[in-house]
Each structure stands twice: as C-alpha cells, then as structure tokens.
Design a protein with these regions (language model features):
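Cytoplasmic helix-loop-helix junction between adjacent transmembrane helices
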Residues: 109-149
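Short amphipathic helix-loop junctions that connect adjacent transmembrane helices
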Residues: 33-50, 240-257
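A membrane-interface helix-boundary motif in multi-pass transporters
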Residues: 163-176, 366-392
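Conserved MFS/SLC helix-loop-helix module at the cytosolic interface between two early adjacent transmembrane helices
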Residues: 65-104
Length: 411
C-alpha cells in the first residue's frame, strides 16, 4: 500500500515524458525544412524567409499571451488532463494546415489555432508539480529537458530525412504524432489534480494582466521573471535562427542540419536527463541557475564567431550545458506556490515565454536579415548570437540581485 503513490507517480512521469517527447518532436521535425518551405511558398530569399519566420512565430506567441492564462486557470479548475488533450488537438490542426498550405497565409492560420490551444508544456510542468514533492521536484523537471532532448533528436533528424523526400512530408508526420498523442492521452493519462485542490475559475486571474498581478505577489520573483524573459529571448537565436544561420554561412544541407540536431538533442538528454540530478544536490538550485546562465552566454558568443561548420558541434557544448538553469529555476519558483496555484503559475511563466516568442524571433530575424541582406553594409550572420549573449549578461546581473532576496508573498 505504501508503494502505491510511488507507482502512480512513476507511471504519470512516464506519460508526461512521452507527451513532451512527441510534442517537441512535432516542433523539431519542421526545423530543417521551414526555411526552404518559406522560400518556396513566399518566393523569397533566405534573408526574407527569416523575417517571415519571425512573424509566423510571433503570431503563435501573441495567441499564447492572450490565451495561456485562460488555459492555465482552466487547468486549476477542471484538471490538467482535458487541457493537455485540447492542446494536442490544436497542434494536430496546425501541422495539418502547414502540410497542405497553398500559401504563407494558411501557415499563419495554423499558427493562430495552435497558439490559442497550445498549453502542452505549461500544463505538463504543472502536472509534474502536482505529483512531485521536496527535492524531487527540481529533478523531475529534468524529465522535461530529457524528453525535449530526445524529441529534438528524433524530430530534427527525421525532419531532415523526410524533407529530402518531400518538403511537406515532415508536417504530415508531425500532425499524425500530435493526433496519436492525443488519443494515447485520452485512454491512458490519469488526472493529477485532486478535486479538493481545485479552485473556482476567475476571469480576473485568467488574463495577461491577472497573471502578472498574481506573479507580482512575489517580490523577488519579478526580478527572476524579467531575467528569464531575457534568457528566453536570447535562446531564440539558436532555436529559430540556427537553420537560417548554417544554411547561409556554411551552405549546409538538410542532412547536415539534422546531424547537428542529433548532437544537440544528445547533449540535452545527458545534461538535463542525467547530469542535473547530480548537480542540483551538489551545487544547489541558485548556483545551478547562475552557472547555467554563464554557460549559455559563452556558448552564444562562440557560435557567433564560428569560422568552420565543425565548430558548431564544439560550441554547442557550453550552450547546451546552460540548460541546467531551466529545471533549477522551475524547482526554485514552484516550491513557493501552493498546489492549487501551480496551473496559474505555469500559465504565467508560459505568458512570459510567449512574450519572448513575440520579441525574440522578430528581433533575431530582423538582425539576421539586416546583416545578411544583399544591400547590407556589414555582412555578419552571427549578429543574433551577439545580441543573445548581451541579453544573457543582463539577465545574470538581475538574477544575482534577485536571488539575494527571499521569495515571500507580498500580502
């Protein structure tokens, strides 16, 4: 009888691993082909395609800003399970639009739908918070990184291979994966939020302003929120500009991008799925956050000034090691919130991430276009990575100051 909660927790974590794996795989599978798809549908060069990609991502993020607080609060009211399933169906519709879109316009339609319903990651992290206690919470958040890494490996490599067959084939596979996961969740996923821990749905808390107000109850958290919004923006230099960067600077093929994706995913699995479980007890949450951010910044600077394609593998090592900061931050923040506030918290953090998705890809896309356009006075495709490193530096200064304070409710 004593082992029952452990068995349930283990089974739930396995499902969340699969959910995040398929979700990230669906996102990663399109990475090698999205530059070529935009060039083809929009009849533009890669510099302009990078700009379009920024707007495409921003459209998704704006919908997330408007609707993620609603989805987070709904998960606190009705449970995590139904929200996860709705999100997966939304992604299935989005990828279907991408697979059969006759023009760029329909890509925007699909991204809008996915942005409205997309709460997979925030609900999954709230789910983990529901079933985790004490020191295991931060370690369990490492599952998110491990699943993301494996999904990234399979997604990017599979996308590179499938894109060589047909440029729209990866989107069909992504749609099928999202649908499969929704069906899998419908029959297998248990609810994690007990009815006694649920609360009434409140519109004043289910909007962007309401989420900021709730986050504002925690003085030091505001500083961390600002800092990690800057980190999210900096990460977009790698997440959304990397294919454009290596296509432009090194004239890589889709297969080459896929191979780099394999390496990045392998690193994420090793660091966030295994190494972090030793580093958190050894260094503590705060030290992991700082060391991770410094490593992020170093990696971005090295990538910016890379001269040969093989160096991308070497310089991705410090960048990927920076991933230890994410689970540490999640564990640090979630420990300050009650069980019936976890959905709202994750909705608020997703809101901040979505703000970075509006600003990051647009800023990084414009900087890439500005320094690679044929009329540019200075040719430097690494500009987005320099900008990202500067944002990391600012975030480190803010985090150091914020962590000196205790996060206590300002009530």
């Amino acid at each position: 009888m004593d082992n029952q909660p452990k068995i349930k927790t283990s089974a739930a974590l396995r499902f969340i691993f699969v959910t995040i794996f398929i979700d990230v795989m669906g996102l990663a599978i399109i990475i090698p082909v999205i530059p070529k798809l935009l060039e083809q549908l929009g009849d533009v060069n890669i510099s302009v395609a990078s700009e379009i990609n920024g707007w495409l991502t921003a459209t998704y993020a704006i919908m997330q800003i408007l609707f993620s607080p609603v989805m987070g609060n709904l998960s606190d009211r009705f449970g995590r399970r139904p929200i996860l399933l709705i999100s997966l169906i939304g992604f299935c519709i989005d990828y279907t639009f991408m697979a059969f879109a006759p023009s760029v316009f329909w890509l925007f339609v699909g991204r809008t739908i996915a942005g409205i319903t997309g709460a997979t990651m925030s609900t999954a992290t709230a789910y983990i918070a529901d079933i985790s206690t004490g020191d295991k919470r931060a370690a369990n958040f490492g599952i998110v990184g491990a699943a993301s890494g494996l999904g990234f490996i399979i997604g990017v490599s599979g996308g590179a291979f499938l894109g060589g067959i047909d440029i729209k084939f990866p989107f069909m596979v992504a749609a099928a994966a999202a649908l499969f996961n929704a069906l899998y969740g419908y029959f297998v996923l248990p609810e994690s939020l007990d009815k006694t821990h649920r609360r009434k749905f409140e519109w004043k808390r289910a909007n962007p302003v309401g989420s900021f107000i709730q986050l504002g109850k925690y003085r030091a958290l505001l500083g961390l929120a600002i800092a990690f919004t800057l980190v999210y923006i900096a990460q977009k230099a790698v997440e959304y500009q990397l294919p454009f960067y290596v296509y432009e600077k090194f004239q890589w093929s889709m297969i080459s991008v896929g191979c780099l994706g394999l390496f990045i995913g392998f690193m994420l699995i090793c660091i966030q799925g295994w190494l972090i479980r030793y580093l958190i007890p050894k260094w503590g949450l705060q030290k992991n956050i700082i060391i991770g951010l410094v490593s992020y910044g170093v990696g971005l600077l090295l990538i910016a000034f890379s001269s040969y394609g093989w160096q991308m593998y070497l310089y991705m090592i410090p960048y990927c090691f920076g991933g230890i900061s994410g689970p540490a931050l999640q564990g640090y923040i979630t420990s300050k919130f009650e069980a019936n506030e976890q959905g709202e918290l994750q909705g608020g953090l997703t809101l901040l991430s979505s703000i970075s998705l509006v600003v990051g890809p647009l800023v990084m896309g414009y900087s890439f276009k500005f320094f690679t356009h044929k009329d540019s006075a200075v040719y430097f495709p690494g500009a987005p990575y320099i900008l990202g490193a500067l944002l990391i530096l600012i975030s480190i200064l803010i985090v150091i100051r914020s962590l000196k304070k205790d996060i206590n409710p300002a009530r």
